[in-house]
Amino acid sequence: MKKNTVLAVVLSMLVFGGWLYIQQKYFPTEYNVPQKPVAQAQGQNPTSSEIAVQTSSNQISNSMIEAVADSDYPSREQTYVIETDIIRAVFTNKGGDIISYKLKEHASAGSDERVEMIENVTERNRALSLALGGHDAQAVDLLFNVKEESLSDGRKQIGFYRDIKLKNTDGSETVFTLAKRYTFIPGDYMFTLEVTIDGKEGMRGLSFGDSAYTLRSAPQIGPEWDKVNDKYEYRALSYFANEKKKEDRSITDGKTKAVNDLASWVSVSGKYFSFIIIPKDPIQKMFFSGIKEEGAKLHNSQFFISRQPIVGNAAYDQYRVYIGPSSEKILNSYNSAAANNYGYENLRIDSLAASSGFLAPLERVLKFVMEIFYKIIPNWGVALLLLTLLMRIIFFPLTKKSSEATKRMQELQPQINELQQKYKNNPQKLNAEMVKFYKEAGYNPASGCLPLLIQLPFLFAMFGLFNNYFEFRGASFIPGWIPDLSVGDSILKFGFTIPFLNWTDLRLLPIIYTASQLLHGKLTQTPGQSQQNPSMKIMIYFMPLFFFFLFYNAPSGLLLFWTFSNILMLLQQLIINKSMKK
């Protein structure tokens, strides 16, 4: 392999790896967008001296909550199912919480089971549980009355309500009705949650330290994933404040984080799905938790949002909840009032769709072109190959120029060797003579690397596109070999896991990819080069093997791009070599 080509490839890969690491760890994507002024937060900074304090602490246990005795309340836990055309939600009358939420149009990888969005549920921790007090207070665990209703416009509602009695610090009692009502619209992944606190006579507010109550997300979102084997999946806790999305992927394995910011929404999202809560009034106090529940396979990725103390004897709070795909097409609809059922403008939850960071505009252009190919041939694998072919054709002149520059360098190498030998003890003189020699020969030393470096932004953008594109999830290219472009291909399941490597399948794409890399290295190697420079020989074989292990479990869509791109480069190199011999 030619020295300049090797240097360019190595430099490209180092820059590529460094770019991925730095972007994910230190510079998560932030979106600057114009936004309407936000309203004052719920019960923000109450100053009334008439607030009855139930406890000065944010913590409150269920032993401090007394259910108002009534024979009409249920005596045992029951579950209720609400279904629309796209979701199936299971509720419990214990707290009025969600214990299962399945997406009917999306299957789990390698299974016909529908994606379960509520994971790690326990008796103490359910989705959209409400706790009186702060994030560390126990969720309300009382049995609620239930009312279900199907409205004439197709919406479905389920409500939970219960009278509750609390002891105040001054010895008095606070009695109120706690109600939660959910409203679902057909064809929409977003629904409404209304929380009502209706105080009885004599109620003078609700305060546990600096919170009235705390609402929580699911303990973990689905689909279930293996953190060790699926390195391309992730969980990120995010919120939107000061016209920016702020993201944190570090809340794992027991870590927690308190956040005090004025946020218009907060979410937990993965590569393909999101759980988002959008309150009517901005959130002021949040808490992120990555604790691991006993018996759970994976740590939680959970957020808590606290409401400010309630003044007076009643409060009504409204939340929109989105539990569904992180598809840019769907999430974008909440940026235009005419495109969604709730009149949202510029909500910017589309910022949760995975992208290439600062290269996102370039990624969108590539996505647009690929979607045109898909309309012509409705197969995402074929559309991917056609986009790769188009990019290789566009960059062929640059590839040819790089090869010609490398050949010219080989022709000048004898004279360069002479200069290096002549001035080996005088580096400054050698540099001056080399500059003079290149100028007289009409050769630019950067001409071999520069054309390859120009292609790097497109390479990064295509990497991000093929690794994260939502439509690849569940999209088949070749049935029996590549049934899902979002996961690795498979021609044989081992039935066990290979230690250290964590391989469970025999995959063909990584083998083809590595073979194409080796062939390309041999094709670009000049006669006798490996004998003259043994490090080149190591590079020819080491780099492909290194990437074989690195990409073995990569999504097949991503690896299909790399492999087909290598094959096209091989063909182009044959054409270039033939033209340069003439």
UniProtKB/Swiss-Prot annotation:
UniProt xrefs under PANTHER family: CYTOCHROME C OXIDASE ASSEMBLY PROTEIN COX18, MITOCHONDRIAL, OXA1
Oligomer status and interactors: Interacts with the Sec translocase complex via SecD. Specifically interacts with transmembrane segments of nascent integral membrane proteins during membrane integration.
Membrane topology: Multi-pass membrane protein
Transmembrane parts of this sequence: 4-24, 376-396, 446-466, 542-562
Gene3D superfamilies reported in the protein's UniProt record: 2.70.98.90
InterPro entries per the UniProt record, alphabetical: Membr_insert_YidC (IPR019998), Membr_insert_YidC_N (IPR028053), YidC/ALB3/OXA1/COX18 (IPR001708), YidC/Oxa/ALB_C (IPR028055), YidC_ALB_C (IPR047196), YidC_periplasmic_sf (IPR038221)
Keyword Ligase listed: no
Location of the protein in the cell: Cell inner membrane
Organism per entry: Treponema denticola (strain ATCC 35405 / DSM 14222 / CIP 103919 / JCM 8153 / KCTC 15104)
Keywords: Cell inner membrane, Cell membrane, Chaperone, Membrane, Protein transport, Transmembrane, Transmembrane helix, Transport
Protein name per UniProt: Membrane protein insertase YidC
Family note: Belongs to the OXA1/ALB3/YidC family. Type 1 subfamily.
GO biological process, one term: protein transport
NCBIfam families attached to this UniProt entry: PRK01318.2-2 (NF002355), yidC_nterm (TIGR03593), yidC_oxa1_cterm (TIGR03592)
GO CC, alphabetical: plasma membrane
Gene Ontology molecular function, alphabetical: membrane insertase activity
Known role: Required for the insertion and/or proper folding and/or complex formation of integral membrane proteins into the membrane. Involved in integration of membrane proteins that insert both dependently and independently of the Sec translocase complex, as well as at least some lipoproteins. Aids folding of multispanning membrane proteins.
